[in-house]
Swiss-Prot record:
Listed name of the protein: Bifunctional enzyme NodQ
Family (UniProt): In the C-terminal section; belongs to the APS kinase family.
Region (G2) residue spans: 74-78
Domain of life (superkingdom): Bacteria
Pfam family for this entry, one: APS_kinase
The protein's Enzyme Commission number: 2.7.7.4, 2.7.1.25
Region described as G5: spans on this chain: 187-189
Annotated source species: Azospirillum brasilense
Gene Ontology terms for molecular function: adenylylsulfate kinase activity; ATP binding; GTP binding; GTPase activity; sulfate adenylyltransferase (ATP) activity
Assembly information from the UniProt record: Sulfate-activating enzymes, NodP and NodQ, may be physically associated.
Length: 620
């Protein structure tokens, strides 16, 4: 199919609630514009038997829905992409699913589009999912919307119905920042106002859908007018004599001899060479994929950002961002994730959930967690500084995803609003005495020994005996026990999932400080969630976190019940008790597993001490 020769490429998506006719609309548009081949048309006719009674028996949604499950259920599940072109323009359209459970798919499509065709069923008006898709489109940086009021052939007094829906959306979308909203009444099934103007709606004097798409001022090509942004995607080292930084020029322009700054380090250099597949060039424009070499030995690597001497990006390790949550498990502030921004990976924590957005009213409400498909404004903290622009200024350098550490699933999509200025005023103080020097004085290697298991499993009993044994051997230790910490430092926390996460986060930071003093730190905490235990591990150097799973069966813990807590939990007087009405996630690969039903506490403590000897943490 030949490329259009008019305004260039337009990326747009169709979105809206389920059964509003998104796939049918795209199929009809392609059909009426003469962009469907004969063999595709014949295949659609065969597949439409028993499903369509008009227009030659064609179900136009079949021209877009590609998955077998989509065709069987007459719904869209995955995002379907189609390229097409007219004499005036070329297009890439993304057909997004309407079901709430597939909102994450819609968000993925929206992140690469510059215009949204938001469908509304004329019979139903604005629905919750319609509003949710409008919010997601706005958050993803889409500034131009076509409000396509579909199925106009199924309503009486269409002009009044259309006007009411247009007014309702105008009021709802006012805070969303759209630069243009064009409302078009249409019938995808019959082709009214899709490509050709409809005689059935003589009161509509605006454009057809295709006519508007061909002329919409919603370009999404990289711009040379913006500040220089070159994202390093990989370091090119074909031999010992060449080291290049390969990536895509997102905006601005590059030229040999030009000054650049590498972020987040802030080191400066000049462009020595610009290398392409066809050889060296002296200039590169926005959108070009090139390899550049620098005239100085500047530390620059994958995930770094190059800018010009003017227009530097923001650099911070704390920032505010809108977050679209995509996982079944809710977002809990304090939990650690992996954050990917461009080609850079860094551990990150959502430190605060400032508010959640009500998709019906756009009101901001207090929330302690963020559920599936919910949108909220959060504060995030990263383990290392990031270079970025606000998402409003650049989608490429202002977006990120959050990834679960265990499943490697993408759980959230983020749009950065601004850095938290308080972070810019904090600087890590270099200490005169190092951790290594403190540890050498004590003849030991600092580490965290983390005892995890159900209440009543024997964690504290074994940890106390391990500490006594280490003290006898002349080692310097500190014991942190769950109840003791909750009586002081964490007395403000309860036992909800969010409070449990914060409890372990604080303990992890305290334990880290104690290892910097050269101590062997013994922590006896239920710590029911794997993610939090792994977050503590990530705070420490490799080999400095040893997980000891005190693996006592629940029935045995209930039988022991040394504090009477299980009896209270089973009677309903104690809520959120681990093992009864709150989950416990056992370690997958602990450094040591202890079975308290097979050996006594002294023998198990000796096994722990032997582990420390083998690891070189404590001398025998």
């Amino acid at each position: 199919m030949e490329t259009g020769t008019g305004r260039g490429l337009l990326r747009f998506l169709t979105c809206g609630s389920v059964d509003d006719g998104k796939s049918t609309l795209i199929g009809r548009l392609l059909h009426d514009a003469g962009l469907i081949s004969d063999d595709q048309l014949e295949q659609a006719r065969r597949d439409s038997r028993g499903r369509a009674e008009e227009d030659g028996g064609i179900d136009f949604s079949l021209l877009v829905d590609g998955l077998e499950a989509e065709r069987e259920q007459s719904i869209t599940i995955d995002v379907a992409y189609r390229y097409f072109a007219t004499d005036r323009r070329s297009f890439i359209v993304a057909d997004a699913p309407g079901h709430e459970q597939y909102t994450r798919n819609m968000a993925t499509a929206a992140s690469g589009a510059s215009l949204a065709v938001l469908l509304v069923d004329a019979r139903k008006g604005l629905l919750t999912q319609t509003r949710r898709h409008a919010i997601v489109a706005s958050l993803m940086g889409i500034r131009h919307v076509v409000l396509a009021v579909n199925k106009m052939d199924l309503v009486e007094d269409g002009e009044t119905v259309f006007a009411a829906i247009r007014q309702a959306f105008t009021v709802f979308s006012a805070p969303l920042g759209f630069r243009s909203v064009t409302a078009i009444p249409l019938s995808a099934r019959h082709g009214d106002n899709v490509v050709h103007r409809s005689a059935a709606m003589p009161w509509h004097h605006g454009p057809t859908l295709l006519g508007h798409l061909e002329t919409a001022a919603a370009e999404d090509d990289p711009t040379e007018d913006g500040p220089l942004r070159f994202l390093v995607e990989w370091v090119n080292r074909p031999n010992l004599d060449f080291r290049g930084l390969s990536g895509t020029l997102l905006s601005g322009s590059l030229e040999t001899g030009g000054a650049v700054t590498v972020w987040p380090s802030g080191r400066s250099a000049r462009i020595a060479r610009i290398v392409t597949f066809d050889g060296d060039v002296t200039q590169a424009r926005a959108g070009d994929a090139v390899t550049v070499t620098l005239d100085a030995a500047v530390d620059a690597g994958r995930g770094d950002l190059l800018s010009g001497p003017d227009g530097a990006p923001e650099v911070a390790d704390q920032f505010a961002a809108h977050l679209l949550w995509m996982a079944e498990e809710p977002l809990i502030p304090g939990r650690s994730y992996l954050l990917r921004a461009g080609a850079r990976w860094v551990p990150a924590t959502v430190t605060a959930l400032r508010h959640a957005v009500n998709v019906e009213t756009l009101e901001h409400g207090a929330a302690s967690v963020l559920g599936l498909n919910a949108v909220g404004l959060c504060n995030l903290s990263t383990a290392a500084p990031l270079a970025f622009d606000p998402y409003e200024a650049s989608r490429h350098t202002g977006s990120f995803i959050l990834v679960d550490r265990f499943s490697n699933r993408t759980v959230g999509a983020g749009m950065i609003r601004h850095p938290l200025r308080r972070a810019a005023n904090l600087h890590r103080q270099e200490l005169a005495v190092s951790t290594v020097e403190r540890a050498a004085l004590k003849r030991q290697r600092p580490a965290v020994l983390w005892f995890t298991g159900l209440s009543g499993s024997g964690k504290s009993t074994i940890a106390n005996r391990v500490e006594r044994r280490l003290h006898t051997l002349g080692h310097h230790t500190m014991m942190l026990d769950g109840d003791n910490v909750r009586l002081g430092l964490n007395r403000d926390l309860g036992f909800t999932d969010a409070d449990r996460v914060e409890n372990i986060r604080r303990v992890g930071e305290v334990a880290k400080l104690m290892t910097e003093a050269g101590l062997i730190v013994l922590c006896a905490f239920i710590a029911p969630f794997r993610a939090e235990r792994e977050a503590v591990r990530a705070l420490l150097p490799d080999g400095a976190f040893l997980e000891v799973f005190v693996d006592t069966p629940l029935d045995e813990c209930m039988r022991r019940d040394p504090k009477g807590l299980y009896a209270k939990a089973r009677a309903g007087t104690l809520r959120n008790f681990t093992g009864v009405d709150s989950p416990y996630e056992a370690p997958d690969a602990p450094e040591l597993r202890l079975d308290t039903t097979a050996e006594d506490a002294d023998a198990l403590a000796e096994r722990v001490v032997e582990l420390l000897h083998r690891k070189g943490i404590a001398e025998a």
